[in-house]
Amino acid sequence: MKISPSEITKIIEEQLKRSDREIDYFEAGRIIQVGDGIARAYGLKGVMSNELVQFENGEYGLALNLEEDNVGIVVLGDYREIKEGDLVKRTGRIIEVPAGEALLGRVVNPLGIPLDGKGPIEASEHRPVEIKAPGVVMRKPVDTPLQTGIKAIDAMIPIGRGQRELIIGDRQTGKTAIAIDTIINQKDQGVYCIYVAIGQKTAVLARIIDKLEETGAMEYTTIVAATANDPATLAYLAPYAGAAMGEYFMYSGKDALVIYDDLSKHAAAYRELSLLLRRPPGREAYPGDVFYLHSRLLERAARLNEEHGGGSLTALPIIETLANDVSAYIPTNVISITDGQIYLDPNLFYAGNRPAINVGLSVSRVGGSAQIKAMKKIAGSLRLDLAQYRELLAFAQFSTELDKATQAQLIRGEKLTELLKQEQYSPMPVEEQIAVLYAGTRGYLDDLPTDKIRQFEKQLLQTMRQKYADVLKAIREKKDMTEEIEAGLKKAVEDVRQAFVS
């Protein structure tokens, strides 16, 4: 009996169809060295840069160094269970984090794993942590203000939605306080917030979470935490994970704010990883691509045009300086990447001027076009007045006789400095800021004792809320200083001043 080749093929095909054996095909390698959170593997020929790989014990790693004969992998979990000779396999994907409104009110690590004990997160989608920043044609100029609720910032260093504004200063000068106040002030503003804690003490982070819950700000906030006891890999990934979560809102046509606290520790974590991976060190032992580390992160903040949904992602990176040195490597890098900086001066802080913003060294390069017209008209001369006051103050120390104009300028500067002081966790709506600054810039406080200024401010706001609520409402809605609004403000300030003086 002759069997044709086609019949043999048919029989083989039928047998194969009946077979239920599945072949699990994957590319794998072997660990040749492990230690200090770094594993070196041989045999992963097709692995991609930044690809997620899985170890035999279930832990994941990130392929960062692709060398001729081995791959340098940073371990994302506990590396002590991984040993030489273990199998490591490719996953074919890059790190993704959950994104969406399910993350609001939650505390997660940079891999999106919940840390708050409130159960699993049912995210609507996952986004890659590293993604290309929006191109030029997708963007539009910054034109909408992001109110921080801090008088000194909203008046003189305004921030717009889609801007990158650096907060820089020595340790314990109030950098995080400004960021937290900004989050609290976004209530009912339609801005979703992501706070990224990099290398912070757990106790400090717990205090921040308590404050945000107490003020009701956790409803629209996600916290991404890589604390001081987490591996350097998680500290390195944290800001990118935070940016990915914020981009979800931006690409959905909404507004988001992301705070990176702080990028000095992020750069230190990256330096640690790079040195362990034997990458050549450069200035201050940082690797050569440390500028790109932060530029690719901060370029993801943008204001999209209407064709792409019109959403925005605003970034407030924080940098900690050492002994007031803003010309160090990392501070100068980030200053050159961002659209301005808020410089906090330790001398002002210890003198009791809080927030301790040094107006002369702080600038917002694009926020001016986003500032509302009413604030522009009221605070236009404020920055110059304060800068001149600081200059005159230095000269006045060496001079005994001052002319009347100089004396008047010194008095005005002193009153304005006092007026710009603000308690922590008490952000102020923009219409109330305008009312207070109107009194200061128009000279109504010049002859009041300096220690009574805060009391006057309190009384003015109380009266405005009770008797002149229509004026505040008009400022809030029209966003401009019309003759009618100015007349209302003038009457309110004069009434309060008269009652206060008497």
Curated annotation (Swiss-Prot):
Pfam families for the chain: ATP-synt_ab, ATP-synt_ab_C, ATP-synt_ab_N
Entries under InterPro entries matching the protein: ATP_synth_asu-like_sf, ATP_synth_asu_C, ATP_synth_asu_C_sf, ATP_synth_F1_a_nt-bd_dom, ATP_synth_F1_asu, ATPase_a/bsu_AS, ATPase_F1/V1/A1_a/bsu_N, ATPase_F1/V1/A1_a/bsu_N_sf
Membrane-related topology note: Peripheral membrane protein
Chief place where the protein resides: membrane
GO CC annotation: plasma membrane; proton-transporting ATP synthase complex
Disulphide bonds in the chain: none
UniProt keyword list: ATP synthesis, ATP-binding, Cell inner membrane, Cell membrane, CF(1), Hydrogen ion transport, Ion transport, Membrane, Nucleotide-binding, Translocase, Transport
Gene Ontology terms for molecular function: ADP binding; ATP binding; proton-transporting ATP synthase activity, rotational mechanism
Catalytic activity annotation: ATP + H2O + 4 H(+)(in) = ADP + phosphate + 5 H(+)(out)
CDD domains membership: ATP-synt_F1_alpha_C, ATP-synt_F1_alpha_N, F1-ATPase_alpha_CD
Domain of life: Bacteria
Subunit structure: F-type ATPases have 2 components, CF(1) - the catalytic core - and CF(0) - the membrane proton channel. CF(1) has five subunits: alpha(3), beta(3), gamma(1), delta(1), epsilon(1). CF(0) has three main subunits: a(1), b(2) and c(9-12). The alpha and beta chains form an alternating ring which encloses part of the gamma chain. CF(1) is attached to CF(0) by a central stalk formed by the gamma and epsilon chains, while a peripheral stalk is formed by the delta and b chains.
PANTHER family with a match to the protein in the record: ATP SYNTHASE SUBUNIT ALPHA, MITOCHONDRIAL
Family classification: Belongs to the ATPase alpha/beta chains family.
Free-text function comment from the UniProt entry: Produces ATP from ADP in the presence of a proton gradient across the membrane. The alpha chain is a regulatory subunit.
Name of the protein in its database record: ATP synthase subunit alpha
Organism of origin: Kosmotoga olearia (strain ATCC BAA-1733 / DSM 21960 / TBF 19.5.1)
